[in-house]
């Protein structure tokens, strides 16, 4: 590329990570050429607003973030409902719709797709849904208008958000999971009891150690699920939350290293192939603050990735230093907040916890190699101190065991 030519950037995936990267590429490289590809027919919308939309707490218009005019103003060539079929790393081109798009730097921000219903009969049924996209949210909401009962299946955050939404829509709500308590890969048993009490207080029927053996159909719809223990539960609407499969297929046949968690990249979000980057849910990246590799599917993490990766795509060397966070409603106006690592990501974590029955909240902090690396907060008004915890994580300061209990009372 001649010195006078503008740099060319291709971004595959127009979610929060990809669109944020495009925005910051334009900010830092005013004369560049940007092509942004997305599978859906929509410009960027706020995925963390889908649960409140499903609860009918906000209108759909509040979910949308960027329109076509914004892309035009920022001179971002937007290609919706357009799949990038493959990448030619030798020629440094992305191929989509029979056309080649040359790049000087390429970003893969394709995220993941929901795993299908985990038993026969669910896939393709008109009343069985995943909960990842705007169209799915519309379909579930429409189904709930006439539903009398709904079932959330899975022990994940997605299943929890479905169960919470079903309860808020005043249908008979069931939450079915294989685990011994909700969110068992993230929470301990004490926190699981807290969630159990909150769910039941909101009218949710909890089914632990329960696995769906079959979605039983009648005239195209599922009439009930049959459990492996022989029990049955009938409903009009079924929401499935069984994790994601990462969309790495665009890199098939390339030298880019991919793990079962996503695309391997360093602390600058660059892969083993120079000039190819990954960001958002799909990035299996090295975090220099927490000093380990992991994948984090949170909204704020995707945005932070987008900002950092843009700097590095234009030739910078900026490491990612943010701390991932997740926060959502937890039945009856309570909240669940998670920050940093969890035992699911680092099994060697040491935990300290506190329950305040009077205030109705639970709090746990996670330590690894004597450093604070994460935590969980449950209950009403139980987010005080979170910023201080995040700063402590970033500081890498060691905390001796005798000092850790007192940290549970941080409120500043």
Language-model region placement:
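Mid-to-C-terminal Rossmann-like scaffold of FAD/NAD(P)H-dependent oxidoreductases
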Residues: 2-8, 27, 282-383
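FAD-site-proximal beta/loop scaffold in flavoenzymes
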Residues: 124-146, 218-226, 231-308
């Amino acid at each position: 590329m001649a010195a006078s030519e503008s740099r060319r950037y291709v971004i595959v995936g127009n979610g929060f990570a990809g669109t944020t990267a495009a925005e910051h590429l334009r900010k830092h490289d005013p004369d560049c050429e940007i092509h942004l590809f997305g599978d859906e027919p929509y410009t960027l919308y706020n995925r963390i607003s889908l649960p409140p939309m499903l609860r009918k707490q906000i209108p759909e218009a509040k979910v949308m973030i960027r329109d076509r005019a914004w892309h035009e103003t920022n001179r971002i060539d937007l290609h919706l409902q357009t799949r990038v079929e493959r990448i030619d790393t030798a020629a440094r081109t992305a191929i989509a719709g029979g056309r080649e798009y040359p790049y000087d730097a390429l970003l893969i921000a394709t995220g993941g797709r929901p795993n299908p219903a985990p038993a026969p009969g669910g896939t393709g049924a008109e009343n069985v849904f995943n909960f990842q996209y705007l169209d799915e949210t519309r379909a579930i909401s429409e189904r709930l208008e006439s539903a009398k009962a709904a079932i959330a299946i899975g022990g994940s955050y997605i299943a929890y958000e479905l169960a919470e939404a079903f309860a808020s829509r005043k249908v008979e709500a069931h939450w079915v999971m294989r685990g011994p308590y909700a969110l068992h890969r993230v929470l301990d048993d004490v926190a699981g009891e807290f969630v159990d009490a909150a769910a039941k207080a909101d009218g949710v029927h909890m089914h632990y150690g329960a696995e769906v053996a079959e979605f039983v159909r009648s005239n195209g719809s599922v009439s009930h699920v049959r459990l492996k223990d022989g029990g049955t539960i009938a409903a009009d609407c079924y929401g499935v939350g069984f994790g994601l499969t990462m969309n790495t297929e665009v890199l098939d046949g390339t030298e880019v290293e991919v793990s079962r968690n996503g695309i391997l990249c360093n602390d600058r979000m660059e892969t083993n192939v120079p000039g190819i980057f990954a960001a958002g849910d799909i990035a299996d990246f090295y975090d220099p603050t927490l000093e380990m590799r992991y994948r984090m599917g949170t909204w704020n993490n995707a945005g932070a990735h987008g900002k950092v990766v843009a700097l590095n795509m234009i030739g910078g060397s900026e490491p990612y230093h943010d701390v991932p966070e997740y926060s959502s409603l937890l039945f009856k106006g309570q909240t669940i907040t998670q920050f940093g690592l969890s035992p699911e990501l680092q099994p060697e974590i040491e935990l300290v916890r506190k329950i305040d029955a009077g205030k109705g909240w639970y709090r746990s902090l996670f330590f690894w190699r004597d450093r604070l690396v994460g935590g969980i907060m449950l209950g009403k008004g139980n987010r005080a101190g979170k910023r201080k915890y995040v700063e402590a994580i970033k500081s890498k300061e060691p905390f001796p065991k005798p000092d850790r209990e007192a940290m549970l009372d941080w409120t500043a």
